[in-house]
């Protein structure tokens, strides 16, 4: 499990993450909320940006994670700082929760449809952060979320998680569907990359991931 607290003049974020879907908690909610504790998968996302909450809930659900993420951001300006900082904080938590990349596949890929939309995601726990995100979104906003911030969120996450990711929406006419299928595909890819191999080794011919 990982816990991250990030406080700047633009955002106040805290999150708890368990990549195996175990119990997670925060000592005190910055939003004054109470979360029931349990042994099963727990997901509570409150960023102040509804569609971002929806995407992160899908990512956690299909990735098999337990996640509590709270953010108070300067949304009176716009959504940029909130979305970017949530990506940074989630990436930091992911890296901590993942730990040493030993005895796992390292590479993963996933496809996810949502009605007419189909997305593909490929990831590498390479310790070499890079993100290519091509979603082909046409709307300026989906709900309260600027569509330009969706790839930026994923880029921020990849940078702090120190993973390589390629996320592409292959087809689709509805931007909500295109985005959601992309996050679900990413969840599937990450879950596959974490699959144990049964060997206690670093999955690299170099012997290190760098």
From Swiss-Prot:
<keyword id="KW-0456">Lyase</keyword>
<dbReference type="InterPro" id="IPR020568">
    <property type="entry name" value="Ribosomal_Su5_D2-typ_SF"/>
</dbReference>
<keyword id="KW-0368">Histidine biosynthesis</keyword>
<dbReference type="InterPro" id="IPR000807">
    <property type="entry name" value="ImidazoleglycerolP_deHydtase"/>
</dbReference>
<comment type="pathway">
    <text>Amino-acid biosynthesis; L-histidine biosynthesis; L-histidine from 5-phospho-alpha-D-ribose 1-diphosphate: step 6/9.</text>
</comment>
<dbReference type="Pfam" id="PF00475">
    <property type="entry name" value="IGPD"/>
</dbReference>
<dbReference type="InterPro" id="IPR020565">
    <property type="entry name" value="ImidazoleglycerP_deHydtase_CS"/>
</dbReference>
<comment type="similarity">
    <text>Belongs to the imidazoleglycerol-phosphate dehydratase family.</text>
</comment>
<dbReference type="GO" id="GO:0004424">
    <property type="term" value="F:imidazoleglycerol-phosphate dehydratase activity"/>
</dbReference>
<protein>
    <recommendedName>
        <fullName>Imidazoleglycerol-phosphate dehydratase</fullName>
        <ecNumber>4.2.1.19</ecNumber>
    </recommendedName>
</protein>
<dbReference type="GO" id="GO:0000105">
    <property type="term" value="P:L-histidine biosynthetic process"/>
</dbReference>
<dbReference type="InterPro" id="IPR038494">
    <property type="entry name" value="IGPD_sf"/>
</dbReference>
<keyword id="KW-0028">Amino-acid biosynthesis</keyword>
């Amino acid at each position: 499990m990982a816990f991250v607290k990030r406080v700047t003049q633009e955002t106040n974020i805290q999150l708890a993450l368990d990549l195996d879907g175990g119990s997670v908690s925060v000592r005190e909610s910055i939003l004054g909320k109470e979360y029931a504790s349990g042994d099963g998968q727990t997901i509570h996302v409150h960023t102040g940006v509804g569609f971002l909450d929806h995407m992160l809930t899908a990512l956690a659900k299909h990735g098999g994670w337990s996640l509590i993420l709270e953010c108070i951001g300067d949304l009176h300006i716009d959504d940029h700082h909130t979305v970017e900082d949530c990506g940074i904080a989630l990436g930091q938590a992911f890296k901590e929760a993942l730990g040493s990349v030993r005895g796992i596949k390292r590479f993963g890929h996933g496809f996810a449809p949502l009605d007419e939309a189909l997305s593909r995601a490929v990831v590498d726990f390479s310790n070499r952060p890079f993100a290519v995100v091509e979603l082909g979104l046409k709307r300026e906003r989906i709900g309260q979320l600027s569509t330009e911030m969706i790839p930026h969120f994923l880029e921020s996450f990849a940078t702090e998680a120190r993973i390589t990711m390629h996320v592409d929406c292959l087809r689709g006419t509805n931007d909500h569907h295109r985005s959601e299928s992309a996050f679900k595909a990413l969840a599937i890819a990450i879950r596959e990359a974490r699959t144990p191999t049964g060997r206690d080794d670093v999955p690299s011919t170099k012997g290190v991931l760098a």
